[in-house]
Curated annotation (Swiss-Prot):
Source organism superkingdom: Eukaryota
UniProt family annotation: Belongs to the type IV zinc-finger family. Class A subfamily.
Designated name of the protein: GATA transcription factor 10
Main localisation: nucleus
InterPro entries associated with the record: GATA_TF (IPR051140), Znf_GATA (IPR000679), Znf_NHR/GATA (IPR013088)
Amino acid sequence: MNWLPEAEAEEHLKGILSGDFFDGLTNHLDCPLEDIDSTNGEGDWVARFQDLEPPPLDMFPALPSDLTSCPKGAARVRIPNNMIPALKQSCSSEALSGINSTPHQSSAPPDIKVSYLFQSLTPVSVLENSYGSLSTQNSGSQRLAFPVKGMRSKRRRPTTVRLSYLFPFEPRKSTPGESVTEGYYSSEQHAKKKRKIHLITHTESSTLESSKSDGIVRICTHCETITTPQWRQGPSGPKTLCNACGVRFKSGRLVPEYRPASSPTFIPSVHSNSHRKIIEMRKKDDEFDTSMIRSDIQKVKQGRKKMV
């Protein structure tokens, strides 16, 4: 899209070529031409340009395609020739102001500034930076996620009890679903039962041996039992009652209806080993005549005495 018509553009070009434009430019710049030596200056400039070396290619990276490429539908802007010197002057003034302000703002070396200005961020560098930041975060999180364990205590483990040492001659019989503790407690209960049976048999044998050694077979005068762990004093004298009857006699509760459950003369309808039940039975005897039952009991006692 043209800013000026073609006729006006041609007139401007003619004015520039005629030299009027450059005369006005020199008047505005006010640069005396007498100070410039035309003969020596040209030779020095040529020698200096010959000594210059071309810059390395790595210093200037390739420009992005967005700046170099131009869309097809977009129209190119044409700048008139009379505005080019004014643009050059404004650019040079901005550059000079930037140079004057940079030393106060930053004190970095020029090489670092140049490399920083021409440094371009590629996708690979962006990925590397992001990967580095993620790795530092992951390393920090891993340090926090795995704390250091403390020292282990030197506590001794509980010793397991071996049943083979306790009962070496008894084979252990356990069901598939039985645990170790259940088997241990069951074996202990079995051993206690055996001990009780052994103690009872031992007391019975000791009483029989003592009666045999005395030459007299002892019988309780109240319940007519033969076996007892201890003979006690009764109304007939010392060692005439069994242990249960002797305890009752000592407390004053020995009645005819009392019999221990192990007595051979124990009849459930007549006798009992509980004092409360005996009182209830006596109340019933007052209501019903129990003389016949008592006579039968006396006959049984007499028959037993004859047999002994």
